Amino acid sequence: MNQRQLMQMAQQMQRQMQKVQEELAATIVEGTAGGGAIVVKMNGHREVQSITISPEVVDPNDVDMLQDLLLVAINDASRKAQQLAEERMQPLTGGLKGLF
């Protein structure tokens, strides 16, 4: 393989990675807690897009529970977004884990 072919392959891979990055930005995953009482929507770049809180879990006397549920939902969405990114990037990275 000559240098020109290597450059073409690198450019093609760069275009494919850009396409995957755009797809990740447009793909939404949901993390939930409390049986769906809290829903966090996050894109494939792990940017929170929205948080929905059911009024039933808003208790001014138990703010700790609400905070715990939010953490669970955010972490759930983050794990799903990470898994999505790994799945989408896997064909381009040859299965190397932990890059994205």
Curated annotation (Swiss-Prot):
A Gene Ontology cellular component where this protein is annotated is:
bacterial nucleoid
- InterPro entries this protein is in? YbaB-like_sf, YbaB/EbfC
Q: What subcellular compartments does it reside in?
A: Cytoplasm, Nucleoid
**Per UniProt, which keywords does this protein have?**
Cytoplasm, DNA-binding
- GO molecular function per UniProt: DNA binding
Task: Reply yes or no: does the keyword Isomerase apply.
Answer: no
Report the principal subcellular site: cytoplasm
Q: Which Gene3D superfamilies match?
A: Nucleoid-associated protein YbaB-like domain
Quaternary assembly: Homodimer.
* Family of the protein in this entry: Belongs to the YbaB/EbfC family.
Which HAMAP family does this entry report, sorted A to Z? Answer: DNA_YbaB_EbfC
Q: What does this protein do?
A: Binds to DNA and alters its conformation. May be involved in regulation of gene expression, nucleoid organization and DNA protection.
Its name, as the record gives it, is Nucleoid-associated protein Cagg_3200
Organism annotation: Chloroflexus aggregans (strain MD-66 / DSM 9485)
